[in-house]
A protein has these predicted regions:
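Cyclophilin-like peptidyl-prolyl cis-trans isomerases
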Residues: 1-217
Length: 217
């Protein structure tokens, strides 16, 4: 990806206390009202979750992507990205989030098992075998609990807890989107952008464009 690709593109989606989103080539010189967020270089990038080493603390640079329904592999956009702002969380809020993460993990495992037994489930439904369906459901629930226990209960690391309760971030995005960098200087600029006035579609009222320079060390 050449740095010129991004020059003149906009931060086209800005949500206060959440993130700023850019990298859509269609945003160059785009008039207000134009639908943005679907453009790219014509390819996606495989998901690369290095979690919990890299997580969504304030300033994290992450890849945007399409939703799970149409992108189950969670592949990243070839160009679109977002910079996290988020908020500071209380410890009890993070504990509640851990419980939600555990439930989400179990639901994901259960859904995978259901998919693996889809033919058997279809046969049982065709034959209206309610007892068989109930027996299979009980079996899948038991397998779900076993697999979830083997994986382990999702918990935030001490580093995450410290970051989310001091500088802030968006912990609910962890392990969902690829984090590939962070802002080392200029968080004050990110703050100004995330505070800018936006229109109904979350696009800034006054365009916020970017230029990019690749620095090799």
């Amino acid at each position: 990806m050449k740095e010129e690709f991004f020059n003149g593109t906009l931060f086209h989606r800005v949500i206060k206390d959440f993130m700023i989103h850019g990298g859509d080539p269609d945003s160059k010189n785009a008039p207000q009202g134009k639908r943005l967020g679907t453009g790219g270089p014509g390819y996606t990038i495989p998901a690369e979750f290095v979690y919990p080493k890299y997580f969504h603390k304030r300033g994290a640079l992450s890849a945007a992507r399409l939703a799970d329904q149409v992108n189950p592999e969670r592949e990243s956009s070839g160009s679109q990205f977002y910079i996290v702002w988020g908020k500071v969380y209380k410890p009890q809020e993070l504990k509640q989030m851990e419980r939600q993460m555990e439930m989400q993990q179990e639901q994901a495992i259960f859904n995978q098992l259901v998919q693996a037994h889809s033919d058997e489930i279809l046969d049982l439904r065709i034959n209206r075998d309610r007892a068989g369906l109930q027996q299979l459901q009980d079996q899948l629930v038991e397998e779900t609990q076993k697999k979830s226990k083997e994986i382990g209960t999702p918990k935030f690391t001490d580093e995450q807890l410290k970051a989310y309760t001091t500088i802030g971030g968006t912990p609910f995005l962890d392990n969902q989107y690829t984090v590939f960098g962070e802002v080392e200087e200029g968080l004050d600029v990110v703050e100004k952008i995330q505070n800018t006035e936006t229109l109904r579609d979350d696009r800034p009222k006054n365009d916020v464009s970017m230029t990019m320079e690749v620095v090799e060390e």
